[in-house]
């Protein structure tokens, strides 16, 4: 289990493609407060990750603490969003597809 946002994004690019993410082609940017920005390029469920603040189809903001609680399954992404701990801009529908990508 990753210990930090940086470690999470470094590991994400080396994961095998999730069956639920087949057919998903999109770009995401995660802006993690005080830690940095990572851009995920998804092509038919295959993920490439780079540390970048470049434009993306879906942009997600959160603190590192909130992100890691979601990654560890200690908090739901939807619950964090509804509580205002996570903000989303751009194609919000793509944020919902993250479950498929990260499963």
Language-model regions, residue ranges each:
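Feature captures hydrophobic
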Residues: 1-103
């Amino acid at each position: 289990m990753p210990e930090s946002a940086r470690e999470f994004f470094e590991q994400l690019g080396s994961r095998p493609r999730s069956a639920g993410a087949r057919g998903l082609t999109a770009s995401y940017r995660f802006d993690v407060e005080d830690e940095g920005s990572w851009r995920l390029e998804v092509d038919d469920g295959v993920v490439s990750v780079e540390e970048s603040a470049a434009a993306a189809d879906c942009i997600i903001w959160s603190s590192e603490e909130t992100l890691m609680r979601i990654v560890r399954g200690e908090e739901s992404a939807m619950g964090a969003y509804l509580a205002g701990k996570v903000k989303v801009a751009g194609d919000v529908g793509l944020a919902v597809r993250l479950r498929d990508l990260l499963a």
